[in-house]
Amino acid sequence: AELRDYEILRKIGIPLPQLLAVDAPHERILKEYIDGPTVAALIKTGRMEPAWLEQVQAMCALLYPAGWNIDYYPTNFVPQNGTLYYIDYECNPYQPEWDFEHWGVQYWSKTDALLAYAAAHP
């Protein structure tokens, strides 16, 4: 599934780590390592860059018309050299209740929702 999702997201134009190798019989993939803390880790320390939200919204502008959502939880994003990378390859057919505006945005600041999720998933 991740290989299919990678191809979908790559064609849409979502910034992703490069897929380096696939071991289909064992269902393993090797992808480029994007160095740096996740957006979730940075938010917990009080750091939030407006450009990150702008870049997620730009991703949404590509995803929604193509009929897709990604997992907008901030552990899936790493900023590096001015680019916000979506480091998970997962995507799902678009459903408004799971889009960024209705679900993901609640986790993109130091909200009770983010802190509760982080406490439950250390």
Residue locations for each model-derived region?
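C-lobe/activation-segment region of protein kinase-like
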Residues: 64-69, 80-122
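Protein kinase-like catalytic domain
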Residues: 10, 63-64
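Hydrophobic residue at the +6 position relative to the catalytic HRD Asp in the kinase catalytic loop
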Residues: 72-77
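Polybasic, positively charged surfaces/segments
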Residues: 29-33, 48-55, 66, 80, ...
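Structural motif at the C-terminus of the N-lobe alphaC helix and the adjacent alphaC-beta4 loop
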Residues: 4-15
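ATP-binding glycine-rich loop module of kinase domains
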Residues: 1
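Conserved hydrophobic core/spine positions of the Hanks-type protein kinase catalytic domain
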Residues: 58-62
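Conserved structural core of kinase catalytic domains
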Residues: 16-53
